[in-house]
From Swiss-Prot:
It comes from the Eukaryota. The lineage of its organism: Eukaryota, Metazoa, Ecdysozoa, Arthropoda, Hexapoda. Residues 67-91 are annotated as: Disordered. It comes from Bombyx mori (Silk moth). Zn(2+) binds at H514, H518, H524. This is A disintegrin and metalloproteinase with thrombospondin motifs like.
Amino acid sequence: MESSVATHWLSAFVILCSFITTQSLNNKIHEHMTIDELRNVFHVEHHSRVPEYHLVQLTHHLARRNIPTSHPANSNSADSGKTPHLKTEKVTKGGYKAPSLLNDEMFVEAKKRIEDVDIMGDPNSTVSVDFKVQSSEFGDSESLSDKEHSAESQEDGVHKIDLEAFGRQLKLVLKKQEGLIKKDGLKVWKALKNETQPHGVDYEEMITEDDEEFGDLYQDEENGAALLIRRHPKHGKLVVEGSIGHDLVIRPIPDTMTSPAQDDEMFMDPSSMADMVSIDTGLPIMKRKKEEQDRLQEALNGAQHVIIKRDPAEVDHMSDYAFMEPDHIGKRYRRKRSAEAHNRQKREAPYVIYPEILVIVDYDGYRLHGGDNVQIKRYFVSFWNGVDLRYKLLKGPRIRISIAGIIISRGRDATPYLERNRVGRDAIDSAAALTDMGKYLFRERRLPVYDIAVAITKLDMCRRQYANDACNRGTAGFAYVGGACVVNKRLEKVNSVAIIEDTGGFSGIIVAAHEVGHLLGAVHDGSPPPSYLGGPGAEKCRWEDGFIMSDLRHTEKGFRWSPCSVQSFHHFLNGDTATCLYNSPHEDDSLPRVLPGRLLTLDAQCRKDRGTSACFKDERVCAQLFCFDAGSGYCVAYRPAAEGSPCGDGQYCINGQCITEHENIIPDYSQHTPSYVRPETSPFYANITSSRH
């Protein structure tokens, strides 16, 4: 009897010790990650820099009585003998809740009443997941309570998630998004140093994974959630990544941690690894201990994601902007408005405008994401989904972000405009880099058509008040006010450019929205407009109110646009210099049988549109026809030249390309940057305005 009791208590003690050990492991799961895993999940390269996070496991259910009879989930029922896609799961943070502590009878009863279905397979389904938080000595512990999930949504692609994390209750209503990526898919290029190519850089289009593997984009406007959701190709579970609100990020846990240990699984990081082993190359590598991998599996308990809380210091950054020319030039050109231009009927902005963004990822950003092209694509699509979400809050004008393409830099020399302006090891002079970027893009004609080019860097951005001053850090973004679609011909510089800093974890989303706002004509709240744009400015809106065009984004207003910003957008988008934003990136213009460009010269087309002449008569007109506007002094891109328009010696515009007559059309994406021209502008450094602190 005594022996039996002793055995019982000994067993209980062993179980308790095992539970506590697993709890501790769960609370510090990041300490068992390799450097590559840290970089993949948290975008940091040292365990001490990992932010606060929760381990999360997602579950999706539909009530059986509400499942449409035509839904394929019916074939996954218990009667069919097929295994459903997903299983009932729970959420943990800090502490681990052993399966033995669950109410088995409640689990069995719930399993009888509900049925797992494929959230991606049913666009009409409504999904609800409830996360509840309770305290433990290891931190907050979250458990999942199953709720009734129905297919009551009447709108395709709407899914609901109820969750409580970091003391906040969130009810996400996620709607599937279209339009950020073009119908023919997202184009991605890699940029490499090559002295034989123009500007010493070679651009090569990359073949990436199909859209099904890539996933679908979802947004919740009210809660500021922008997510990319896909199915894992092996086990079929949902993989979710993106941003929630201004400080939460959800990321998947690497497969190397969620998969059982394999004999051929090798790691270079020495933390929690076995002794070094040798392979044929003679180089030492490290292998994670099987016992360690098993403990990770037990601690994760099937969790596939982490919710990360960003440091507020990473959210609130200063922003700078530059004016495009001195004030007196803008006034003079407004006085020169000709009677012909004044009487010409103005083209009003459409109900929806589509800024097409060319995303340029520098080499440090490439390394930040582990050099994984697929992950880089997913991250930055999720990133711009978050930026687009901020513009979705505008009810008028309606602005829909579209990605023209992504360029991934495979070396520092692939972005020479950044490299030439390095300050020390980890910073760049933002004003000088922006100027050089504009000049580089003016000469570069191998890139896809775009309205705005944005370089994204992990490097710290700094500013000099004067040429030889110290470069003061703290800036996170830099752009020209009203620069969208604009080129300075005298200085040979594109003004439709911006540089933003992003250190991972979607820290640069609001900064990107802010800088694109500058390019679309908005100034900082509390500031007057530049004279060359005119309009309402933002003097009536206080900087301290903390809207997007302020740097004091400490409340929910940091997701919204001030009334002054909205008025500035209206003014800019209805001006003569914004017409390149009017075309939809998804228009499918079929080739007409009679080519109108053979009937009207480029000058004749401009006379009909602007009453003036064409600014350029080379291959650029196939992407955008620039016509001189006497009223503003700019060359304005109204639309592409008509099909069949001449674009060089014996060459004509066909499907947006300048080709020799009867030549086969082979896509090479060599169209020139959409741009405007304004003569007699002054050098950039004479017109820099800093943000308010």
